[in-house]
Amino acid sequence: MLYYLFKFLEEQYQLPGAQLFDFLSFRSAMAIILSLGISTIYGKRIINYLRAKQIGESVRDLGLKGQTEKAGTPTMGGVIIIIATLIPVLLFAKLENIYVILLIVTTLWMGAIGFLDDYIKTFKKDKEGLKGIFKVIGQIGLGLIVGCTMYFHPQITTKEVVTETNPTENVIARAEVVDMGPEVKDTTTTIPFVKNNEFEYSSLISWINPSLVNYAWLIFIPIVIFIVTAVSNGANLTDGIDGLAAGSSAIIVLTLGLFAWVSGNIIFSDYLNIMYIPRSGEMTIFITAFAGALVGFLWYNTYPAQVFMGDTGSLTIGGIIAVLAIATRKELLIPVLCGIFLIENLSVVMQVGWFKFTRMKYGEGRRIFLMSPLHHHYQKKGKHESKIVVRFWIIGIFLAILSIITLKVR
């Protein structure tokens, strides 16, 4: 909203300094500063409110050291992340941008599902929370919205061959590129570490009959649904010990922010020989606000946690990361960039699958890990949770660097 206000003041009254709001870098900086302020300053007030209303975590005894001490810790802290993200976005982003709209919808959609789950657990005293089938339906619903928007919306395009305009203006991330050239409506994505790294989803169906290329949405939309569901569940499983989900997600989000910025900049996309995605640079405002909210939330969520994000936060985080990866055409990089989420997910799948298999074969269930998800396995081995979290963050940073390298190494 401030963007439109200062744009008006610049055009009508030539207000000194109003032109700053034309620059993506300035608005991104303001977004992260404001989100950090909201999440740290007002986050404390929200935590006190949650504590006063006795909205606390009910902890099941899983035999983990220090677990029972966490009983009663305020939960639903994901609302801090959501509020600290949306306020800067509404103030500094271009609200007509389709990518910004999609991310706002994702935040509210997944936040509502997570909030309902936490509400049932906390107020209805049902430890299972929202039934799993309803969570999955909600995730599928979001995936359907994202998939249809990405495929059918006319403003979501790519451009492989760029035409250089004003190098100085673009390098400093001026808000808009004047001459973008022809835009292409397609379902192209990028394959990491491959020289000719562009992949068209329509090729999965067009080989049967070239005329089927118009039905590529039959392939593309289900893939988007799968990605949204998988990543949101991965983030949800990762939120098991203090600071793990928020810290790991901040690393992932900042990396995706870099991808969004270079993909939305005509000069850098040309220099790096990557796909230019018109209008995607505006996502940087959302990403910086979201990253600031996560870091601010960590102020209270690191060991010993003063608040838990609950499903309100974890499902929202996973949904946003999935949509960011899809929007920047980096969804095939998710197994690398979101490697922490992946191993947490796989540890649960392997544990459950092996237990069921051995029970059928030997009459008793056997386990691969002492406990799943993987972070609980290390807790069972006697590792302190703060050490586990920091080591997972280090792995996350390594995976983020590896992901960034794909911009140039093919």
From Swiss-Prot:
Transmembrane stretches in the record are: 23-43, 73-93, 95-115, 132-152, 211-231, 248-268, 285-305, 307-327, 332-352, 387-407
Q: What membrane topology term does the record carry? A: Multi-pass membrane protein
Look up the record and name the pathway of this protein: Cell wall biogenesis; peptidoglycan biosynthesis
Co-factor requirement = Mg(2+)
Single GO cellular component term = plasma membrane
Listed EC numbers: 2.7.8.13
Does the keyword section mention Manganese?
no
Q: Which Pfam families match?
A: Glycos_transf_4, MraY_sig1
Q: Which family does it belong to?
A: Belongs to the glycosyltransferase 4 family. MraY subfamily.
* Protein name, UniProt field: Phospho-N-acetylmuramoyl-pentapeptide-transferase
Gene name linked to the record = mraY
